């Protein structure tokens, strides 16, 4: 069984919004691109979200989504609430 990993690009407007929110909150983000993992000769695939590391906290984001997941996919907030969250940590 062979797993194929393809890196996906950040949606430019999403990255700009995240950079703006982080700049306004006076924090420095580290961006790590997500990927698509496909199992060869099947129709199975997994989309690994982009990671944004801020103050030792990993935020997960998907292209074309307004949700931000904190540490894992169980806890999410809206992108509009991110500034408030960053100021609270």
Please state what every model-predicted region is.
Residues 27-77:
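Acidic, low-complexity, intrinsically disordered interaction modules
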Residues 1-24, 28, 75-89:
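Mixed-charge, Lys/Arg-enriched low-complexity segments
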């Amino acid at each position: 069984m062979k797993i194929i990993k393809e890196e996906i690009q950040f949606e430019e407007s999403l990255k700009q919004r995240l950079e703006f929110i982080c700049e306004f909150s006076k924090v420095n983000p580290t961006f790590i691109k997500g990927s698509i993992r496909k199992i060869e000769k099947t129709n199975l695939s997994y989309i690994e979200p982009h990671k944004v590391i801020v103050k030792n906290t990993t935020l997960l984001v998907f292209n074309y989504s307004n949700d931000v997941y904190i540490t894992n996919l169980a806890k999410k907030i809206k992108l509009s609430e991110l500034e408030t969250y960053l100021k609270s940590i």
